Amino acid sequence: MSVLEKNITRGGEFIIKETDCNNVFTPEDFNEEQLMMKQAVHDFIEKEVLPHRERFENKDYKLTEEIMKKAGDLGFLSVAVPTEYGGMGMGFVSTMLVCETISGACGSLSTAFGAHTGIGTMPIVLYGNKEQNEKYVPKLASGEMFGSYCLTEPTAGSDANSGKTKAVLSEDGKHYKITGQKMWISNAGFAKLFIVFARIEDDKNITGFIVPNEADNGITLGEEEKKLGIHSSSTRQVFFNETKVPVENMLSERGNGFKIAMNSLNVGRIKLAVACLDAMKRVNSHAIQYANERTQFKTKIIDFEAIKEKLAQMATETYVGESATYRAAKDIEDRIKIRHESGNSFQEAELKGVEEFVIECSILKVAVSEDMQNIADEGIQIFGGMGFSAETPMEGAWRDSRIGRIYEGTNEINRMLSVGMLIKKAMKGHLDIITPATNVGKELMEIPSFEVPDLTELFSQEKLIIKNLKKVFLMLAGAGIQKYGDKLEEHQQMLLNVSDVLIEVYMAESALLRTEKNVKRFGEEKQKNQIRMTKLYLYQAVDIIQSKAKQVIISSSEGDEQRGLLMGLKRFTKYYEFPNTIELKNKIAETLKSENKYCF
């Protein structure tokens, strides 16, 4: 076992193991090459995107296509593509960093970029054969052609495998004829290549096809959809009427389409999270700057505690989201590297590396998309009446952020998926949660210790709380499995509450690990606000976990069992020294005021 493999946590393992802060990646660990790439993308956005904000809001689809072509000329579309197919072949973390930086200024461009570089290109990169990759991927990487992903249908949304689009083999066996209707297809208006999912005969699972958008081949487009947000992202229905597709354009193998679709979503989920981060930072900065300028009652509104509270909360959610997203991104990159070194092909290593962290990807998608919307909403509130005006950046940010909770599987689906996949891993023997869950059960039967632990060392209380919050999850999961067995997935409200416990543990621990690592590296004084944000978020996470766990316990138990579980919850969410959250928020806000921007 390599040193790397020994030190990194496996997917989902965070809930049963303690992680050393030295073994996590933080944004402060970006290397020189990554920072140069980030700056290049930032400069591109400042020059090519920000001056045209009004055009993007006015449904200028041509502008989006033009900007995408320019991004292709600069190589930004090819970061994740192997060098043999015209790409940069950069790692997973670098791919996420480019995605973050290019996505924050404009939701329309974020959608177009994500749809093309992700689900419009990577299914061929990861599932296509050599000939398919050589034929299509260099053109996708350069921006010579743009890709689009045709999965959703009028009757097949979350239930993606229920699509009715048909693929019928021609009599001469040389083509499939695809007939059906796809909807909500991003980039459809300018895509020259479609990844299309259709069912062959009465197959249980759908099949993927690479379908060039050629004239006179039975492909027609609906009108541009009228959407709440992302106004200049092309979104249309795509109709196929006996569209001829050469048999050699089948992607992977027959019946493998559902697997392709699900694995594409895994990558899409963490990419959606990272795409929100720069937008969150920008909204933070806009709100801070406005609050520093706006005067009411002869006082700058940033000096009112009601505004300080909002700004501190917005900054905290941004810091935590960034901490968790890049933690997971590096874990995925490391797992891909380990698989490469053990002899896996590029495709196998990439697919298995991401698939292992499907739980974390779902967690991030939910947490960061909801924080993004909350931050945009509070940004409007800080702007007051001006925030409701399309003349300010807040109105567009709020509308664009709403789609995040729907993309890549709704947040409800992802919540249930995170817990379901964790339990499935346990049942398959890939993750031992049975032993720690059993140990938690034994601990509940013992008389609790009333000894106050030594809390003099920085984060000693926070580490203890994180450790105990993991026990809360194990307690709830164990009780749920014991009562409902394999029918647990039918109890969706219970799963949604349990998943919120899982989410808060991962997010809070990620912030703690980042801050602890950077305190060791830069010193406590330079990390004082990060320490405050970490403590603030954890305290709020405990509040959420107490509420969610109580609902689960009350709904799934009664009598002595219920009383025992509630006592266990009280024990595992105990604070010895309560943080002064009002003071923490005021001090965080004072730094934001002096820096006049998001600065963490």
Regions found by a protein language model. Give the residues of each.
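A short core secondary-structure module
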Residues: 174-220
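Glycine-rich phosphate/cofactor-binding loops in nucleotide/flavin-utilizing enzymes
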Residues: 2-23, 97-98, 119, 375, ...
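Glycine-rich phosphate/pyrophosphate-binding beta-alpha loops
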Residues: 104-107, 156-157, 183-189, 267, ...
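Amphipathic, small/basic residue-rich leader segments at the start of a protein or domain
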Residues: 1-114, 131-135, 139-146, 158, ...
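A structural signal for short hydrophobic beta-strand segments in well-ordered beta-sheet cores
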Residues: 165-169
